[in-house]
């Protein structure tokens, strides 16, 4: 190995050793120490070394080169002299091109180097930027783009020696893409290939029979070289002369300054190679001879504008350089290393550091480097340099960062990992002895530590969400409070066992079967639960009497204590979906024994619970019976003190008298009804009440079993009431509970009651009350026949006669339903009423057209229907003359509906006449046109006079101007009336809007 004019002999190696054939692995631990001297005295060096060699038909050639790179000037036209001088070292089996520095030997001329560059000329070149004439070739920019995979030797078209960006395998990036503006690396290659196979990174000779395949090698060790005392070299000159290329560094400065990548990935804080002007010689293990140092080269006098800063804390790295040896191939193939390089002054990686890169800490040695050493060097094999007078401290073990970087040995993207050496993990520390083949070629990323369960387990008040869901599902299956109690006990056992086994936070509660929760009946030790169970076992069919009935003497009722302790303690479970969301929020309270208390809602969840609580008990026959088995509500809890005081007063004599007086309100005032009450058995009313409550219970049970059942699925026949009451006259009372058959009249009694209403001479309010009572009895008994239609028709006629349109609408809607079911009745009569009502009052054209479309041709021939259609035509066209003619000849109850519209039609008629006629209109004409006289009384003078008076009164009431002519006839002044006519307020109008509710009639009802 030649460096700075020093000659180094390489020791022979075992050709069969794989370790000697393959490249460097920087992950091995090194131990070394340095002793430097100014003379030729050797310094001991203990550790591994590397032979980074190219293989030439089984021979190992030590192809080393070194070239300093100056910074290109601003003009970008500086021509660079050859950086290297190619020469070969003689061996028994082949020749190898060995790079040699300019500063270590005297000038001489050879056939391959006629320029004879001396040390002085080379130094002056740097100081004065002198340009030597040479043949200029353009620099191929990125001619060989490396895609990350190893390129075969046959893929490069190399006719001879060329200077270009080195392309080598084993990296993910093209080295040419990451060169900084401070310098550019270029090398001269001397490839002699017998078979015309280009070798990109080797200076070798390959016979044609080898076909460029350098995998089959023969063992041929190097020959020992005798160092020359005069610093000359015993070497043969290569037959192919080197060709020097012109380098344009400014071109690369402009090109690479456009990129955003400041430096090659993974080389942000790596050390920078430096060479000393004062080189010294020291022995290297595996080398048979020593080379004396040459101190004849002067230091450059120029100031380097750019200089990569070194970092002593970073490890030495193997630099592929411009040529790639077997070490580079084996580095890509991740094979075992043979020797390892040691650099007292760490060499710069092939990818240069950016300008802004700063070391972690500086040493005087680094400052000395920045002041003295050249910019950089490229070394194919391992060599050692140290400044004069510097003593390297003994280092027993490399840093962890060094081990990691040497192990990975790949450039990384600075955007992904800007600080590669500092981002190692514990795995990298433990695997320092592992080979490069075992470590993946990726950047190590610190993985987040998995969350520990100790955080959740440290807080005794929290439980896993899956456990809460398991508890909710378990309680959702409970149908009554007994199952809830047993489920509670079972859940406590399960949670306690899980805590003892330390599986509370590790068990998968989402998949835990609910069969583990036993729902066996648990006997409650509290006396209140025993009392409740005895009450619940009683028959629920017996219902208490109404609170308005006289109270039967018996023991005062004492409300039992709260029996649903579990419901109160754990909250009443609501299996509805909207309540399940709220219930899971408050599952944080912990029981003292097991640390488990499923409180489902912080608010009063019982208010919306599906199961109601036990209502306050009532007495019937001196025994307290449970009304239902439902849980108690908050409203009853709040009213518990009031209930107790009320029950205490219920047994007093004063309360009995009050209830007796209230019950008399429902008794008949007539003597026969009083006598009937005396003949009734003592508990007759009680039995009727029980029957009514039983019906209500059956109905509620149907809805409880399936609240979403359709109406058609309910067995209404089982709930039909058959009346037994024989009273003809009965007042109407709104139903608040299931009907009592004893108070419902059968069908024959209802027919008698209808005849009684039709023949009665009482007012409309009495008849309406009786008819509504009849309708109620028909409804609860589900009677839909001709009697039902007759009752509704009678009530509708009375409502029309009284002008009670709301009641008429109710009757008419029921009649339409009955007629649609095929029940016989006066369908055409009420069809005419419907047409008149829609035309005169609702003014709903769509409904009017729908009603007219349902009429057949035969229906339209009916007198009432034909009259209704004529009235519609008169109202639509505004023909008031035709309207009042039809009003006089209206059949059935059509005139009653028209009476409600007569006032409005007369106002429109007078308004039309006053605007269209001038100057006056006789009042006698208005009387005839507006229908103030009846048709039967037209020939009598008395009726005509009455009509005249009524007409004059109406005109004056509406603001008409009446004058008298010379003959004494009454005339309407149309001009004055057109501006003074108005619609007055009705005289019988009341504040509540229903004129039928007269004050006198209201008092008669009480």
UniProtKB/Swiss-Prot annotation:
Residues 804-978 form the PCI domain. Residues 26-75, 106-115, 144-162, 269-282, 313-326 have a biased composition (Polar residues). Disruption phenotype: No visible phenotype. Sac3a, sac3b and sac3c triple mutants show no visible phenotype. One of its GO terms (biological process) is RNA splicing. Gene3D superfamilies: 1.25.40.990. InterPro entries: PCI_dom, SAC3/GANP/THP3, SAC3/GANP/THP3_conserved. Residues 1-75, 106-162, 183-239, 266-326, 516-550, 595-638, 650-690 are annotated as: Disordered. It comes from the Eukaryota. Residues 609-618 have a biased composition (Basic residues). Residues 653-680 have a biased composition (Basic and acidic residues). One of its GO terms (cellular component) is nucleus. It is found in: Nucleus. It holds the Pfam family SAC3_GANP. Belongs to the SAC3 family. PANTHER family: 80 KDA MCM3-ASSOCIATED PROTEIN (PTHR12436), LEUKOCYTE RECEPTOR CLUSTER MEMBER 8 (PTHR12436:SF4). Interacts with EER5, SAC3B and CML20. This is SAC3 family protein A. It comes from Arabidopsis thaliana (Mouse-ear cress).
